[in-house]
């Protein structure tokens, strides 16, 4: 991990110190391996910071008409709130007008999941995702809608489990109505 390369305390030791600070007995059998598991889980949740974006494969359009929008609704993804490092459960809907070829469906989904795998502020993430999709999909236009359930306000602070945040971004001339539903685990 990056922290180890910088010669800083091993991440597991930092987690162990935090657990002790919170009053946990870190020698307890159920907790003794928690620092290692926590660091591994956090690594998975932030893999987008270290891994390159997935390659996008394109297929020829094979027709002469102007392509209409392609819509992919309710892509499930998980991110972290950059302020509290608590999970954000996301449902992302994307529409794009293909440029020179159509990207593979699974590649679009993988790209969204990769983009979400990092600490984010949802408002900024939505704008960045629209730019990223325009570039990587070689699209003529893109629309994005992100519905997020933020654990930082679900389990702490206002403790409201019924809300969700919806953010939208659009690039180019695209006329679609996206329907992004609350993430599946939060319905």
UniProtKB/Swiss-Prot annotation:
Q: Which residues bind Zn(2+)?
A: 81, 84, 152
Q: Which domain of life is it from?
A: Archaea
Q: Its annotated pathway?
A: Cofactor biosynthesis; 7,8-dihydroneopterin triphosphate biosynthesis; 7,8-dihydroneopterin triphosphate from GTP: step 1/1
Has UniProt tagged this entry with the keyword Nucleotide-binding?
yes
Keyword annotations: GTP-binding, Hydrolase, Metal-binding, Nucleotide-binding, One-carbon metabolism, Zinc
The molecular function GO annotations come to: GTP binding; GTP cyclohydrolase I activity; zinc ion binding
Q: Which reaction does it catalyse?
A: GTP + H2O = 7,8-dihydroneopterin 3'-triphosphate + formate + H(+)
One Pfam match, by short name?
GTP_cyclohydroI
Q: What is its EC number?
A: 3.5.4.16
Sorted alphabetically, the Gene Ontology cellular component annotations on this record are: cytoplasm
Name one process (GO BP) from the record. tetrahydrobiopterin biosynthetic process
Q: Which residues cross the membrane?
A: none
The signal peptide here is none
What InterPro entries does the database record attribute to this sequence?
GTP-CH-I_C/QueF, GTP-CH-I_N, GTP_CycHdrlase_I, GTP_CycHdrlase_I_dom
UniProt-listed HAMAP family: FolE
How does this chain assemble? Answer: Homomer.
Against PANTHER family, the record matches this protein to:
GTP CYCLOHYDROLASE 1, GTP CYCLOHYDROLASE I
Family the entry assigns: Belongs to the GTP cyclohydrolase I family.
The identity of this protein, by name, is: GTP cyclohydrolase 1
| Gene name tied to this protein | folE
């Amino acid at each position: 991990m990056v922290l180890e390369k910088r010669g800083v305390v091993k991440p597991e030791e930092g987690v162990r110190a935090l657990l002790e600070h919170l009053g946990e007995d870190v020698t307890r059998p159920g907790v003794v391996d928690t620092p290692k598991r926590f660091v591994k889980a956090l690594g998975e949740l932030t893999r987008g910071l270290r891994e390159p974006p997935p390659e996008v494969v394109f297929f020829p359009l094979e027709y002469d008409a102007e392509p209409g929008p392609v819509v992919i609704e309710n892509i499930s993804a998980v991110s972290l709130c950059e302020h509290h490092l608590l999970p954000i459960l996301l449902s992302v809907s994307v529409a794009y007008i293909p440029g020179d070829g159509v990207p593979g469906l699974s590649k679009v989904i993988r790209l969204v999941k990769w983009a979400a795998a990092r600490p984010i502020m949802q408002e900024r993430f939505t704008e960045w995702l629209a730019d990223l999709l325009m570039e990587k999909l070689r699209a003529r236009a893109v629309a994005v809608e992100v519905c997020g359930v933020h654990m930082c306000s679900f389990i702490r602070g206002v403790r409201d489990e019924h809300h969700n945040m919806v953010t939208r971004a659009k690039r180019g001339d695209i006329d679609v109505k996206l329907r992004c539903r609350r993430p599946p685990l939060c319905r």
